[in-house]
Amino acid sequence: MIVITLPDGSQREFPGPVTVAEVAASIGTGLAKAALGGRVDGKLVDTGHRIEGDARLAIVTDKDADGLDLIRHSTAHLLAYAVKELFPEAQVTIGPVIENGFYYDFSYKRPFTPEDLAAIEAKMTELAKKDEKVERRVLPRDEAVAYFKSIGEDYKAEIIAGIPAGQDVSLYREGRFEDLCRGPHVPSTGKLRHFKLMKVAGAYWRGDHRNEMLQRIYGTAWASKDELQQYLHMLEEAEKRDHRKLGRELDLFHLDEHAPGLVFWHPKGWTVWQQVEQYMRAVYRDNGYLEVKGPQILDQGLWEKTGHWDKYRENMFVTESEKRDYALKPMNCPGHILIYKQGIKSYRDLPLRYGEFGQCHRNEPTGGLHGIMRVRGFTQDDGHIFCTEEHILPECVAYTALLQKVYKDFGFNDIIYKVATRPEKRIGSDAVWDKAEHALMESLRASGCEFVVSPGDGAFYGPKIEYTLKDALGRQWQCGTMQVDFSLPERLDAVYVAESGERLFPVMLHRAIVGSLERFIGILIEQHAGALPAWLAPVQVMVLNITDGQADYAAEIAKTLQKQGVRAGVDLRNEKITYKIREHSMQKLPYILVVGDKEKAAGAVAVRARGNQDLGVMPLDAFSQRMASDIAHKV
């Protein structure tokens, strides 16, 4: 007898080997119909998987995260099937699941057009309606190579040829299409009903620019029509909020082919940058951080000591001068240790907190660049705390509270907390890791934060907390980090004198709140759809005159506000007032002040708030108080 234990602890007995589908059917016809796969002793498998002995089994349906992955993986194969039906000469390569969807790369003699994409999607729908069974078979490696060569799929043959000799490979067939795949997959194409193809892009074979440029078709797939529609609606909203589009429209920044991955900040955009930086500078000052500044170029020898030269060199920009090799720093930590090492440090000096708006450069591949969110040159609000093991808990508690306040001030209230614990390969004793992991978790508990643990995801040199924002569209952005480091101070021989007189290595806490300022400003632009709160807005107020008769008064109003520290402008153009109001409203200004003869005579202003709100006529002092309140309360 084979005993199958279900998630609720109940057990079912079978006289011999049994498939996942058969177990589901024994539970009920509804579950049998809904089953997409199963988890057998933790391993995700097809419904056709045979269970040969006692096992724990969870049936996977479209209500599970695993089920959604199965749907997306199988829809990628459905895409390839449709392409081969419509374009038999196309060669298939790879098609993985990605966040919110999937893609598949194809080699074809001409670019796919939008009309092709529509035809492919229609063919996918047609094939799904056939509800063709998805079947798995296993071949020896060499036989699989020969098979794919015989049907003209050279890329698949090349992939399989890279698998060790003597190893079997699995293939999945649906209808007339068969593909190399580890699986698992849904039991039939009829399970794939809610999908959409999104776009075509270029991608090099195996990610190598020396290889052929392939065509990558992206798609999304969901468990229900409602979920698909919600996702597509979110994408429409995201497109409206796209920081690249708003950056152009609001004249904040631009990107140029002469400097790929680097940002040209315009006056308005640089004003936003300055507001974020000055806010964070005050955070440093008010929380015991000493601001420092390190050089951008450091000698190869330092990067060899830190381990970056071996592990990270491909992502570093290197240069040479007078027969010495240097690198633009990809991070600020080594520089902070060199500052720490100047002079003897005592246990009385700890914790010692350094902060820097450090400009870093990383040689990101061109295909990975994205507006100001993913760049090659960026500035971090980078902080490092040198401390003892006993300081880890209180420092993390203080940091989490600080981070929560900062995020709230910028308009983010939904934060996800994750603790990444020790990996298999690590340095330091288990006792030290126990203490560090406990301190990180206790710091979150003390801050009233629910968190998830991600086992094994810590760095080799220490565990960390990741702080992820949720924006107005529900998207997640990992910004903040608190990383414990037992390694780098020792690598660079940074010590402190303990109370006993012994020289010890400090613990180093790497922390950032907003992370890359470029990326964070991009997130802010999208969070607020370009309508930044008054305290951040590059232009807070625009004063408009109705006729030339109020030009001097309008200019005087703007000058008075500027003296009060308000970022005010004045538009004295001889244009219709409705035209000027509409034009400045499109710039998403917090306030527009209109002055005509009545306002001039009364020493007042007519106030229009963002969103076409008419706040009426008020004395300038009253408006100034309102503006000051908005800035003080970060609205």
Swiss-Prot record:
What's the family? Belongs to the class-II aminoacyl-tRNA synthetase family.
Residues noted as binding Zn(2+) in the record, renumbered to the chain = C333, H384, H510
Q: Positions of the region Catalytic?
A: 242-533
Q: What is its EC number?
A: 6.1.1.3
Role according to the record: Catalyzes the attachment of threonine to tRNA(Thr) in a two-step reaction: L-threonine is first activated by ATP to form Thr-AMP and then transferred to the acceptor end of tRNA(Thr). Also edits incorrectly charged L-seryl-tRNA(Thr).
Question: Can you state which reaction this protein catalyses?
Answer: tRNA(Thr) + L-threonine + ATP = L-threonyl-tRNA(Thr) + AMP + diphosphate + H(+)
* Originating gene: thrS
Q: Where in the cell is it found?
A: Cytoplasm
Question: Which BP terms does GO give this entry?
Answer: threonyl-tRNA aminoacylation
Record GO terms (molecular function): ATP binding; metal ion binding; threonine-tRNA ligase activity; tRNA binding
| HAMAP family the record matches | Thr_tRNA_synth (MF_00184)
- Keyword terms, alphabetized: Aminoacyl-tRNA synthetase, ATP-binding, Cytoplasm, Ligase, Metal-binding, Nucleotide-binding, Protein biosynthesis, RNA-binding, tRNA-binding, Zinc
This one is known as: Threonine--tRNA ligase
Q: Which Gene3D superfamilies match?
A: 3.10.20.30, 3.30.54.20, Anticodon-binding domain, Bira Bifunctional Protein, Domain 2, Threonyl-trna Synthetase, Chain A, domain 2
The cofactor named in the record is:
Zn(2+)
Q: Which GO terms describe its cellular component?
A: cytoplasm
